[in-house]
Amino acid sequence: VANEQKKEGEFGSRENLNKEDASAAEEAKAAAVPPWIEVSTDRTYLVKPTDVGHVLKLEIQPCDAKAPAPNERGVAETVVTSRVIPAPSPPKRNLVPIQKNDAVEPGSFTVMSYNVLADVYCTTEMYGYAPPWALSWYFRRQNILKELVQMDADILCLQEVQSDHFEDFFQGELAKYGYSSVYKKKTAQIFSEGKYVIDGCAIFFKKDKFALIKKYEVEFNKAALSLAESLVGSGGSKKEALNRLMKDNIALIVVLEALDSQQRQQTQQTGKRKLLCVANTHIHANTDHNDVKLWQVHTLLKGLEKIAASAEIPMVACGDFNSTPGSAAHGLLTRGMVDNNHPELQIDPLGILRPASKLSHPLPLVSAYSSALRRDNRLLESEALERLRDRVDPRTAEPMFTNCTKDFFGALDYLFYTEDTLCPVGLLELPGEKDARAKYGGLPNTQWSSDHVSLMAEFQWGPAAMNGY
């Protein structure tokens, strides 16, 4: 302003004075900006908490590796981000206590089931309503890990764990929190980003609470081959049967021994161990193949029957069953049978569901959520359960949803247990539809890093839990 008031003859034109003032202002502004700090030269960079509040600049300079002079480089290109914000955290969910049964044994354990959405399926084409950065595996894996660590379950049953991510992330990261693990991938692979990958099921367990006694792997494709051979003998086409039945789904089953100090003392006194059988599965998803879903569930149950025949062992069967309450598969699991008039039995192109009487099992399986919330076909009145009552379907007492996208809203995931040997004493709070659809309209989003939500239950041992398996 002072310079503008000077005469033009002394300091030049007013236009030049304005330019000089602007230049000085730019120099002062530049001097106030702190210098860039190099944080990485790797091809990928995972934002750190110390980056919050700062901007990041990516600088790429082309060079010719074959050039005689190594210093011959092209013009650098740069991209500057917005200021780094704190990473959204998964919403806090609490374990809701349920009235305890005086007849149960002391000691309890928690089991979580969670479809974590494999990266190979998490695309902008599928989930375009979410910001691309929220779909990035480098973000999602940290958010999922936060949730798993926060819940601190004794046993984790995860579905859609990508094979390479089990090896280079889940296995190592969860080992830091005291988990041992077993993994079974599906029986076909997908070529993605220059390598073959596929998802599968993983079971993690706290190694100070459980020890692995035995592992079983169920490949439904192997069972399909055997079934297809029998269908040929009855006039069916083997090729047709295999095309319909071979969907690459699997199940993973483990037998664990409880390691708490009280249990060790009981084992020494009685010679019997406290064991637990845990099954984790991901059933076929296509709604046009309900016969295949039902057959896969029945095949899994037959495998569990064989284990149960060797010892009276408590069981937890969980996972993504891709079956809604009221479906034939859900009915088989919870009622031990399928109604002969169930509409899903009418679509049976291979003739594998008849007679319906063969679709049965003797295992006393019930759903953790519905059994705890419902008695005599009505929801229980309980102050402790009030936080769950409005999040479950009043007709079935199952969660209103475990999967929420723009195209689907409903329950597909479950925690089943044998009611004669285990008793649920706590259930994880369920999110509401408003929570899941907030801002983006569905899952996944910036807070929820899968299209599924996790389920968790706390169990106490029933009086028949001791066995000599």
PLM feature spans:
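Intrinsically disordered, low-complexity domain-flanking/linker segments in eukaryotic proteins
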Residues: A2-P35, E229-S237, D260-K272, P343-L359, ...
